[in-house]
Regions:
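Short, exposed beta-strand-loop hairpins at the edges of beta-sheets
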Residues: 103-105, 112-126
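N-terminal glycine/threonine-rich, aromatic-flanked beta-hairpin/loop signature
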Residues: 43-74
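Edge beta-strand at a domain terminus
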Residues: 70-72, 119-135
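C-terminal motif of bacterial Sec signal peptides marking the signal peptidase cleavage site
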Residues: 7-9
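Bacterial signal peptide processing site
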Residues: 11-14
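Tryptophan-anchored aromatic micro-motifs
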Residues: 19-40
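An anionic, turn-rich surface loop/hairpin at beta-sheet edges
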Residues: 79-105
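Sec-dependent signal peptide recognition
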Residues: 1-4
Length: 135
């Protein structure tokens, strides 16, 4: 019995260390400069505690989303404004209505997989978000 209690106590300490490491990894992704690709399109991300700006390299389109963090690994993005659209890019859907719920999965020091769902369709998106090597 004493041995079982000892094993349980050791596992609890190990789990807390893992939780603290995960929390630190998630914290590194809340603010910073990142990028991702979808097909031939390349996007740059600038994220603050309250907003995420996404810049489409090919068109110069710059869109800002309001961020709401539900916990360390889940956040929602809601359209805020188009900051720049020099080529008058036509969007395939009404971006002003979009709201995405994103979950960080497979988090490492260099990237994570964003699992996203939005209010415009029933599709689940999986996108690798990569930390820029120079901020």
């Amino acid at each position: 019995l004493l041995f079982c209690i000892f094993l349980f106590a050791c596992n609890q300490v190990d789990n807390k260390q893992v939780d603290n490491q995960n929390q630190e990894q998630f914290q590194e992704w809340k603010v910073g400069n990142f990028h991702y690709s979808e097909g031939s399109f390349k996007y740059l991300i600038h994220r603050t505690t309250d907003y995420q700006e996404e810049f489409l390299l090919q068109d110069g389109l710059l869109v800002r989303f309001k961020l709401n963090w539900e916990n360390d690994s889940v956040y929602t993005m809601k359209f805020d404004s188009i900051l720049s659209n020099p080529n008058q890019t036509q969007l395939a859907f009404d971006i002003t209505q979009i709201q995405k719920k994103c979950t960080m999965t497979k988090v490492t020091a260099h990237s994570y997989i964003e699992r996203s769902e939005n209010n415009l369709n029933d599709l689940v998106g999986l996108t690798r978000i990569i930390k820029n090597t120079r901020d």
